[in-house]
């Protein structure tokens, strides 16, 4: 496993973003782990988050994009910090773009924030976590309505590796529907592999009991 992946897993634990216990997802699934990206709150945390995304982007995509798009709402600050990190770390200077939930009818009108989307633009979408893919299904029509725009990829922080609308994962379903490449900074398989019986800040994060519960969860909800 690459060093940046290990660092990112510990970073999520330190920020209280990745936790283990008893949770219920929006879809009603009882899950033994939860990823709450709303816990990235400080400037230093957001800066580091952008850097991890930039590393994943650099590892998985050529420089064949000119817009980083973050779906509202969490994707708005995410798209900004990712574009800054790409510039700082790799000298890749691209624009950010996000959508509003409501169309603005005064001042800077329209549904987009940041850069406008024009014919020929190549867009890389950044999202926090995709369980069902709902936000991307909502976002793609907005992007496509702007003109002849090519969406080249989707980058998320954690691939939960769960069933989407069918038996396949949400990311695979999105890839098949829209024809782009997706990637994650880490997968839950990598998270479990790295944290199982490992101490982080003096505490074992995934012990035998939690590991068993995770295994049982994926027997029922894991993507085929």
From Swiss-Prot:
Its EC number is 2.4.2.10. Transmembrane segments: none annotated. Coiled coil: none annotated. Orotate binds at residues 131, 160. Its cofactor is Mg(2+). GO terms for cellular component: cytoplasm. Pathway: Pyrimidine metabolism; UMP biosynthesis via de novo pathway; UMP from orotate: step 1/2. The keyword Transferase applies. GO terms for biological process: 'de novo' pyrimidine nucleobase biosynthetic process; 'de novo' UMP biosynthetic process; pyrimidine ribonucleoside biosynthetic process. 5-phospho-alpha-D-ribose 1-diphosphate binds at residues 26, 73-74, 100-101, 104, 106, 127-135. GO terms for molecular function: magnesium ion binding; orotate phosphoribosyltransferase activity. Keywords: Glycosyltransferase, Magnesium, Pyrimidine biosynthesis, Transferase. It catalyses: orotidine 5'-phosphate + diphosphate = orotate + 5-phospho-alpha-D-ribose 1-diphosphate. It holds the Pfam family Pribosyltran. Homodimer. Catalyzes the transfer of a ribosyl phosphate group from 5-phosphoribose 1-diphosphate to orotate, leading to the formation of orotidine monophosphate (OMP). Belongs to the purine/pyrimidine phosphoribosyltransferase family. PyrE subfamily. This is Orotate phosphoribosyltransferase. The gene is pyrE.
């Amino acid at each position: 496993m690459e060093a940046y992946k290990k660092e990112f897993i510990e970073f999520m634990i330190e920020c209280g973003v990745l936790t283990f216990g008893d949770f219920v997802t929006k879809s009603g699934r009882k899950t033994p782990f939860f990823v709450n990206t709303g816990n990235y709150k400080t400037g230093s945390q957001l800066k580091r988050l952008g850097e991890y995304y930039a590393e994943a982007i650099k590892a998985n995509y050529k420089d064949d994009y000119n817009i980083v798009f973050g779906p509202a709402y969490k994707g708005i600050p995410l798209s900004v910090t990712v574009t800054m990190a790409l510039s700082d770390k790799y000298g890749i200077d691209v624009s950010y773009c996000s959508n509003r939930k409501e169309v603005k009818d005064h001042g800077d009108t329209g549904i987009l924030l940041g850069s406008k989307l024009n014919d020929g633009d190549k867009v890389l979408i950044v999202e926090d976590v995709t369980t069902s893919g709902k936000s991307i299904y909502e976002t793609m029509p907005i992007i496509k309505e702007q003109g002849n725009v090519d969406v080249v990829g989707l980058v998320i922080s954690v691939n939960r590796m769960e069933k989407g609308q069918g038996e396949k994962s949400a990311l695979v379903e999105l890839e098949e529907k829209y024809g782009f490449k997706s990637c994650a900074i880490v997968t839950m398989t990598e998270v479990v592999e790295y944290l199982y019986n490992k101490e982080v800040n003096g505490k074992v994060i995934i012990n035998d009991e939690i590991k068993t519960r995770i295994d049982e969860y994926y027997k029922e909800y894991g993507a085929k």
